[in-house]
Amino acid sequence: MQNVGPTEPSKSQVFRCPAAGCKAVYRKEGKLRDHMAGHSEQKLWKCGKKDCGKMFARKRQIQKHMKRHLTLKKHSCPTAGCKMTFSTKKSLSRHKLYKHGDAVPLKCSVPGCKRSFRKKRALRIHVSEHSNEPLSVCDVPGCGWKSTSAAKLAAHHRRHGGYRCSYEDCQTVSPTWTALQTHLKKHPLELQCAACKKPFKKASALRRHKATHAKNPLQLPCPRQDCDKIFSTVFNLTHHLRKVHLCLQTHRCPHSNCTRSFAMRESLVRHLVVHDPERKKLKLKFGRRPSKFLGRGTRCPTPVVEEDLSHLFSRKLLFHYKTRLETNLSGLFNERQLREPAEPEVNLSGLFQLPQGRPKAEKAA
């Protein structure tokens, strides 16, 4: 089983390098795997050229290498007998310095030691011999490979014997790391919490379980004043409010012989297994919202809404400060100010210009 330690839940998940003394942090797990390959010297990336076949530990290394195949190597070494060609002048000058010139050697910094080396790895191994650090030596006959890291030795051993399956009952040895990953998918995934040794079949269930072992777990208290219940998930808090305080058990069992009702739809789906034992796999879709556009003739179910929910909440939590009442609200409106105070008009006929009617003709006597 794979032991996965508890981690604190966070909104933005980060992946930290577990190597000692390394503080690298990445947002994507693939970036971390690429970085860890540099620590363990696992060369997972292979050049696809027919005549090349070089292996690299990191993705950016093979990307840089592939550019060499695409670019023309115009700069050739002028030394007699050397047929090396390079794409840049800088690479050519480095080649002439270390291969044919007098390159500055890497000298040992230990007092009294006059050894010098051309590669940094050889210098690190030599310095570890002065400090009496334990060296990891390859035990394959005729190899004699040395390293100061046990992880690098394990990566070196895989070059001799391939990549062995980590399961105890499986003796499969894959020639490449990619073939090993393909083989591991055939084994059933078994995850185990490192804190309580509880097994899980899904990685999502293990992540939710690890939140219970966090140093600062999420605490959601019940908003009612006379209730001291505290929950770790929003689902449990919602279930508590609907069942205990609101008594909203609207999800009834459809079977005629069963009178059970539940506050949450997920609880009803789990209950249906009692009536149908052959139904083993449940695919619950949490947080599913109804479609915005319904078909013709369909009606959206009317939600049960309680009018007065004030008894569920504490007023101290809702109102952190006293409200201020504004008595003079005249400053909020942009009204035209009158120069002189208006007087009430009794006769308003002078404000209107009404057409005068023609005088009626008098009847002749």
From Swiss-Prot:
Pfam families registered for this protein in UniProt: TFIIIA_zf-C2H2, zf-C2H2
Zinc-finger ranges (C2H2-type): 15-39, 45-69, 75-100, 106-130, 136-160, 163-187, 191-213, 220-245, 251-275
Molecular function (Gene Ontology), one example: zinc ion binding
Disulfide-bond pairs as recorded: none
Matches recorded under InterPro entries: TFIIIA_Zfn-C2H2, Zinc_finger_trans_reg, Znf_C2H2_sf, Znf_C2H2_type
Transport is among the record's keywords: no
SMART domains: ZnF_C2H2 (SM00355)
Alphabetical UniProt keywords: Metal-binding, Repeat, RNA-binding, Zinc, Zinc-finger
Coiled coil: none
Signal peptide start and end residues: none
GO cellular component terms attached to this protein's record: nucleus
Stated role: p43 is a 5S RNA binding protein which is a major constituent of oocytes and comprises part of a 42S ribonucleoprotein storage particle.
Subunit structure: The 42S RNP particle comprises four subunits each of which contains one molecule of 5S RNA, three molecules of tRNA, two molecules of p50 (EF1-alpha) and one molecule of the 5S RNA binding protein 43.
Entry protein name: P43 5S RNA-binding protein
